[in-house]
Amino acid sequence: MKFQVKALAAIAAFAALPALAQEGDPEAGAKAFNQCQTCHVIVDDSGTTIAGRNAKTGPNLYGVVGRTAGTQADFKGYGEGMKEAGAKGLAWDEEHFVQYVQDPTKFLKEYTGDAKAKGKMTFKLKKEADAHNIWAYLQQVAVRP
């Protein structure tokens, strides 16, 4: 009986792995991130540029994974919709990131429940696969230890 319970538990845990796995390809994400570099940069806490140029239009994406929306300390350009989403508990994960980058204003309106909410990010990523790939890339290079 003990063996059966352990075997079933192992099978259940193994079956859940695909749900926990990220959907994107980090290498493809590095290439797709080129679209983001016009406005964003990834600079670590020591000042080392990981990706991007000197873009300051959007926030530094280092540490974005799990960060509360609208709270990058040295970025002052957040719109009210983004600040409201953060105040309502939005923390960046793959699901929300993918939705946001495909249509920022639509996402903020839905997340905040405010029909007047607007995203300052006007760029819309056309391919959902690119969004997943960029998220996978950010998980590799932009996570604080």
Swiss-Prot record:
Residues 1-21 form the signal peptide. Heme c binds at C36, C39, H40, M121. It is found in: Periplasm. Gene3D superfamilies: Cytochrome c-like domain. GO terms for cellular component: periplasmic space. InterPro entries: Cyt_c-like_dom, Cyt_c-like_dom_sf, Cyt_c_1A/1B. Keywords: Electron transport, Heme, Iron, Metal-binding, Periplasm, Photosynthesis, Pyrrolidone carboxylic acid, Signal, Transport. GO terms for biological process: photosynthesis. GO terms for molecular function: electron transfer activity; heme binding; metal ion binding. The modification Pyrrolidone carboxylic acid is found at Q22. Binds 1 heme c group covalently per subunit. Cytochrome c2 is found mainly in purple, non-sulfur, photosynthetic bacteria where it functions as the electron donor to the oxidized bacteriochlorophyll in the photophosphorylation pathway. However, it may also have a role in the respiratory chain and is found in some non-photosynthetic bacteria. Belongs to the cytochrome c family. This is Cytochrome c2. The gene is cycA.
